[in-house]
Amino acid sequence: MNSILQDIRYAGANNFIGRPLAGYGAAECVVKREVGLALKAIQQELARQKLSLKMFDCYRPARASHDMVLWAQNGRETAAERRYNRAFSKQELFRLGYIAEHSQHSTGAALDLTLVDLAADNLARFDPARAYADCTAPVQARAPEGSIDMGTGYDCSDAKAHTAASSITPAQRKWRNTLVAAMSRQGFVNYSKEWWHFSLPGAGGAAYDFPIMARRN
């Protein structure tokens, strides 16, 4: 999996909470062995098309999901949060299935990811000092993710982020279908409300809560 790109968003401040989540001591993608082997096969297939996977989230400590619950109980809202969620209260995000109190990620069997065009040049970088448009805006206006335009940003709580959304362009639909097809060929199942979320049936089990730490050399 060494060639797979990573941008583990909950290990930093570029996420809907605006800070690192509990348990993310390092920006590392941790997965179960069978998940990793499947990802390796997908990456090899995509490389022949000059594409790469980019991971946004992998294993998520259970304490991080609890951190999200505590965040939702705080009624205050920031401009950064509004980039991800224009329409719903924080509490509604759980009821509508955009955030889970108990996440598949904590079993090591779920992933959030996207596609990167390896031939693309001069990809914009996220600037924490800049005011970006919300996650449904055109790609030139919303926060950059260094990846192919999938129609919304990652973690966007909006119907436009639903994998089969009708409001996206043909090109955006093509790339979503490319990602789903590549993942499906190795047994992954997409979550219909989030184009970026996939899980591997049979790889789940008990939830874990060990913190994510930097790899030792």
Give residue ranges: language-model regions.
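Active-site lining segments that contact anionic ligands and/or coordinate catalytic metals
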Residues: 195
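Extracytoplasmic cell-surface/polysaccharide-interacting catalytic and binding patches
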Residues: 1-58, 62-84, 88-192, 203-217
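Conserved metal-phosphate-binding beta-hairpin within the catalytic cores
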Residues: 198
